[in-house]
């Protein structure tokens, strides 16, 4: 899929290697917030069956999604309690950075520790199960058109849901991590802006790196999510059985629809 300037972390999951082939293009699209999409950008997306918005009510109110012709809109906020203060309570980048720096000044636990807790909490969230169930069923029921699922940056909430979808489709963890970490490439400009904002506010390299820890994708965070899944549910199939109402037939049909033998 062609890169869209207003939504740099929007990407088709097509082409990722899985157990019996590759993820089929035009089925699963992960993204950050869509509010900057223009009509010409929406036209590039092709047929969209549904949009799953995982943002909070406040995030949606400030930056509502644009209308995508023919797409069903489903709002399932995934908000683990620990992430609300430093992600959802502020709107502008300087405000978000200042909010995070409050934790730095108060000697709160390192960003890596806090984010591992956030990622583990998202896996155990009932809303994550609802979102995964919805995406799977939309693909199975609609059969044509892509499903877009997104949060604000397309990193944390979209990252966890993507990892679980790829686990279900049979991707190796190396492919799952590669997809997750691509966010740092897609959002390289935004990451530099966050670091610069922190330096401007406090003038401390250590503080700037602390802030950057909340904005970048880090493999240890995703590892916390996958470890939580494995320890509590033993497998993605166990997760689906306990946290969703997706049947075995629906899971297999989802795989059939989303996997092709060779990449386009």
Model-predicted segments: where are they?
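Ser/Thr-glycine-rich phosphate-binding loops at phosphate-binding pockets of nucleotides
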Residues: 153, 157-158
